UniProtKB/Swiss-Prot annotation:
Belongs to the UPF0354 family. It holds the Pfam family DUF1444. InterPro entries: DUF1444. It comes from Listeria innocua serovar 6a (strain ATCC BAA-680 / CLIP 11262). This is UPF0354 protein lin1649.
Length: 266
């Protein structure tokens, strides 16, 4: 495979995503390509896409195209919340994630941890749209009604687990690719069940939108493996969240910083 450069990837993306109503803008300083359609903008980090391309080949390009097309489709449609609350889910994002749209509309959010924030989304099948506060006002819904519906729906999602073990440390992965893998971190009853089931310290990570990692950590090797694993997932994700894992104690999530062979608490 010929080496993919920034210029080649930029040109490839512009060719694949080109449509009459779209504009492209390349930012050299941040090495990003912005795609704008009808006032809606998607920003693509080219180095990350190149890294994924080197690992996955054409599948990485296809995934980006799908992500952009579905994103614009979701942004362009009108949604009705009141009679479709079964389609509302909570979504985890980094605290740095913008809480307003490009048009200046404020998104519906809740506080979560020092590293994460809860947003609310309306599921569209292959994608979802973030819920804005003005949507609630138009339909006469309260924040609490949306929150309750979202968490009720989250509790109905299946949570298939894949297990791996390293030197007595057990790791469980949730990777359904339904858009809500990281959201399972918000399922309190699931976390409580896992805490009762696991031995060792229970540590969780949501490096990006499409994975939840749960570790039953027994020693420094376990922390070391989790740290490397979380960083790898964080670098590969289309929607990164946080590279910091969380210790789960007494029903609370506390971010921790882990260095190789060592665990440094808050």
């Amino acid at each position: 495979m010929a080496k993919m450069t920034t210029l080649k990837m930029k040109e490839r993306l512009e060719k694949e995503l080109n449509k009459p109503n779209r504009q492209f803008a390349y930012e050299r300083d941040s090495d990003t390509l912005s795609v704008t359609q009808n006032g809606k903008k998607v920003t693509l980090a080219i180095p990350q896409i190149i890294a994924n391309y080197e690992n996955d080949g054409e599948a990485a390009i296809e995934k980006i195209i799908y992500y952009v097309e579905e994103g614009f489709l979701a942004a362009s449609g009108n949604i009705e919340l009141k009679n479709n609350t079964a389609n509302i889910y909570p979504v985890v994002r980094a605290t740095s994630f913008p809480d307003t749209t490009k048009a200046g509309e404020v998104l519906l959010t809740d506080e979560h941890t020092a590293e994460t924030k809860i947003f609310y989304a309306f599921d569209l099948g292959k994608s979802y749209r973030f819920i804005e506060k003005n949507m609630l006002e138009k339909e006469g819904l309260s924040h609490e009604e949306v929150r309750k519906a979202a968490f009720d729906n989250l509790g109905k999602l299946e949570i298939p687990l894949k297990k791996d073990s390293v030197n007595g440390n057990d790791f469980y992965f949730v990777r359904t690719n339904d858009g809500y893998d990281a959201s399972r971190l918000l399922n309190v009853s699931f976390l409580q069940q896992m805490r009762e089931k696991l031995t060792g310290e229970m540590v969780l990570a949501v490096p990006h939108q499409d994975v939840l990692i749960i570790g039953a950590i027994k020693d420094n090797t376990g922390y070391d493996v989790l740290a490397h694993m979380t960083m790898d997932f964080f670098a590969d994700g289309l929607v990164p969240i946080t590279s910091l894992p969380f210790v789960y104690n007494n029903g609370k999530l506390e971010p921790i910083f882990i260095m190789a062979k060592n665990r440094l608490k808050e």
